[in-house]
Amino acid sequence: MSFKNLQQLLKEAAAQERCGRVICYSSGNLQNPTSRSYHELMQEAQRASWALRTATCARHGSAVLLHFDSHWDSILWFWATLLAGCVPVMSTALPNNTSLRTAHLEHLSRTLNGPLCLTRARMAPEFSEQTCIEPIAVETFDMQTSSKEDHVDSAPDDTAVMMLTSGSTGRPKAVCLTHGQILSSIVNKLSVVPLRGPFMNWIRLDHVAALTEIHLPAILSNKDQVHVQSADLLANPVEFIRLASEHRVAKTFAPNFFLATLRDALCATQHDSPKWDLSGLYIFSGGEGNVTRTCDEISKLLGRYGAPPNVIVPGFGMTETCAGAINNTSCPWYDIERTSDFASLGTCMSCIRMRITDDSGGNTCVSPGETGNLEVTGSAVFKEYFNNPSATADAFTSDGWFKTGDRGLIDTNGYLHLAGRLKETMIINGVKYSPHEIESVLDESNIPGLTPSYNCCFCSFPPGAETEVICLVYLPTYPEEDIRARIQTTDAISKCIVMLTGSRPVIIPLDKGLLQKSALGKLSRSSIKASYEKGEYKAYQDTNSHLVKMYRQAMRTPPKDELERSLLAIFVDSLELSEEEFDVQTPVFDLGITSIDLIRLKKSIEEQRDIDQEIPMTTLMANTTVRELSAALHDLQAPGTYKPVITLQNEGSKTPLWLIHPGVGEVLVFLNLAKYIKDRPVYALRARGFGAHETPFASIEETVRTYYAAIKAKQPRGPYAVAGYSYGTMLAFEVSKQLEQGGDTVGFVGSFNLPPHIKTRMRQLDFTECLLHLAYFLALMSEQRAGELAAAFAGVQPSQERVLDEVMQNADPVRLAELQLSRQYLLQWANLAFALQSMAVDYDPSGSVARMDVFYCVPLAVAAASKQRWREEHLSQWRDFTRSEPRFHDVGGAHYTMLAPEHVFGFQKTLRGALEARGI
């Protein structure tokens, strides 16, 4: 080994004359990847490292949480963090459940000692409703400059990366993997099978296999590496083989459930006779048990395209062992000869040793063929969980072997076979879940029909299945004959578990006599699971299934419009359903679909309905019927007439927050903010004049009447919370006065950086200024360029067409395309903005509201010389128009950027604190 750390590994690879490449396919794109050499990766990582060090308080050796969903971002910032002398922590996907997500982030903050967190701006809202981890959007970093300062070096025993153990519903531990452990592991991985071509990965880099099975070994061997988004392959498994053939892949990874899906897809395409070349391909498989039959069938199918007989390599590995450490290179014939239902996991790499011990606690090994506790040791095995000495101590035997938590046996040939788990964890499609956490969430959800503390969650491997299924038995509160309550309870439980795991459970209501608690008030999970697998609950399961099916058929509901008809057809076709068993009111998870089916369904809807924007997976999970999904999608497709109210966020039970548009009339600026607010609905008021046949408001009075009526129609009773951004503050003030005059309580009035007196500024804004401000506001050009054009037009009165010509010529064409802005629409928008400004040229504030919160930032240069003078000389005048002392809140950013991605996290914390302080 010629290097002592990972930084040297990359530096060595980047220096090669013909170095390998990182090839990345973006989401939804399987045709046109990006490609960067290891030399280019090193250069970009050095720039990113410099940006990280200069823009943050990153300290040498401190943890940096990396939360990305694209392969390139994860790779780039992994190396940037290492080069900066920090320790990358690969963040897993956050739980969908709000309380679990908050608890997860709070746990990470404590465990990692308040880490920096890097992410993309579009992902920052995932960190809402908590304040312990503040995400930093990497778009805010200056990536164009860098220092000649070289990377920070590391010793072999230094921690290179922290990987989080599966914490989808439990509390993850941070596994410290050192440079030496990783290097030992990846060197040995290259000798398991002959690897002559590129590597391919399709799982996130927060999974240790993506890092230590694919990314780092590819760099070590100076081979290309191909990265594909998992959703694209799950939706179309045949693409996995096409890409492997196209790139002449030598090594990739796939768990058993995907191998089964791939087998079925290949069987369906055999008549097409594709000309694939899979010679030299090896698919390593782990994470869950490999069914011998599946390995045999897929091996034969792949063999038709030149794959070696042992193309499938089952194995055992954990985060704590740098992923795969034990491999079976004799699959499937080794297990076929022994008539084993599940494939053996093989023998150890040279850097790992394994043993099977008895339950005596004396580190006594059992004889070959006897079942016991699997323990491992070696240079690729971790030594500690970060900041968790008790878990570290529990993880090792008295003589220093790592306790894997698995039961197994080693046969007379030295091959490992697993025989279950010590801990009550469930593995569904290769992901671990805690049954305790699922039960807790169900209890906390207060589901009608479900008796609290009388539900038991476990997993089972049905005969002939490819992966385990989640089972949930519960004690119902409804009478046995109340079929409607039975259905509603089943639907609610199913929806909750699917949101947590992405997998549809088997749900069985049982009599209380079958759910006996111990003296300590506990249900015996092992006994209940054993009874289920013996068939003791089959009569209850069959009765429940029959009643549910009969109810669905009797209550079958036809589609009410074209969208529902279209969606129903897509559901039936995509999921291969019978129209007799499925209608617009049938929860899709009642049909036993998997997360893979859900991804495929999502893609089909987006393509066949020609929906421009991606449908969030949570939308499908939360809207489980065609009717619910139709309602959720309707606003995306229906143009409609002028409707001032835009629903930005519809969750939560607290007082709704009303946000009124700035001077450009649009509410897009509030989208980032609304994503962080989950405890109350967020509505925005949009100006009239954007529609093809709409005319702008003629006066402030008309605007206020319209907005007042819209608010009352949506929220008939107070208390109210109303805020406006810039120009919108004036409208928020006037609307709030109207509400108070009608006898309503307005508990919160917010001014986002606007003083009460605005007419002088309004008189300065002619059409040219409005158009240029709009162009800058929409990021069509820089503030500097907008100022230069304003100076060029100063003292003249150019026509609208001439100003528009200049703006279109100077506008960023990519941004124009993103916004789908035509010349005519931009002109219409500018006229709307000008109309709004014009109706305030004689505005003088009068009257008062009970209270006001003023959020202030760096003002426009024409408005004040400093933030302090802006507050003291201008914003302070709100005291004349409130019946109590206004509260002032200093926020980050400048007038046009206070709600931008780089500042919105801090802003929303301040805003939520202000709302809470007002008791609203």
Curated annotation (Swiss-Prot):
Modified positions (O-(pantetheine 4'-phosphoryl)serine) are 595
Gene field: atrA
List the residue ranges of the region (Thioesterase (TE) domain).
656-905
Q: Name one GO molecular function term.
A: transferase activity
Q: Which PANTHER family match?
A: LONG-CHAIN-FATTY-ACID--COA LIGASE, MALONATE--COA LIGASE ACSF3, MITOCHONDRIAL
Q: Which keywords label this protein?
A: Phosphopantetheine, Phosphoprotein, Transferase
Reactions that this protein is recorded to catalyse: 2 3-(4-hydroxyphenyl)pyruvate + 2 ATP = atromentin + 2 AMP + 2 diphosphate + H(+)
Query: What's this protein's name?
Result: Nonribosomal peptide synthetase atrA
